[in-house]
Amino acid sequence: MNRSLSKRAIGLGLSLGAMLTCQFAAAADGIGGAGSSAAAPVYRTWAQEYRKAGGEALEYDPVGSGAGLARIKQRQTDFGAVDVMVPRNELARDGLVMFPTAVSGIVPVVNLRKGGAPLKLSGEVLARIFLGEISHWQAPEIVALNPGVALPNEAIRVVCRSDGSGSTHHFSDYLSKVSPAWKARFGVVGR
């Protein structure tokens, strides 16, 4: 696909998304969107390319899937981006249409402050870390998965989101599938 055609396709996709998602323009000037922080880089790139191609300004606020969904339901924005499917009856009730625009992945990130081999964690070990059952990098379960890797004698500091997030939903869904203890205690959360 050549660059000009690509720009037109991006513009058309954004325009259709805005028109189908909301029956009126919430933004006074240009197109406004809000939602998934994971998808923000894609929307920023599309907005820049669409503007270069002569389209309207597009502003995207990466407030998280939950807040984006709330804003589109309250007609505070032209489109909302979420990482989790919204039930059909909810879409119908609120006069919304949903279609996929991007795909993203979730990867735990660690900072051991030492170079070396990549760290390996199983789903069960990851769940136990987030449950607080494994609290140090030199825990036998982590050492067993990483033979020969020099692990620090330090506590694991877990950082996570607290808002309604599609990433939280998908991550907790995964942990629920690999850990009966996680499923029983928390289950799938976020959206």
Regions found by a protein language model. Give the residues of each.
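Flexible loop/hinge segments at secondary-structure junctions
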Residues: 26-191
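Bacterial N-terminal signal peptides
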Residues: 11-23
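N-terminal secretory signal peptides that target proteins for export/translocation
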Residues: 1-7
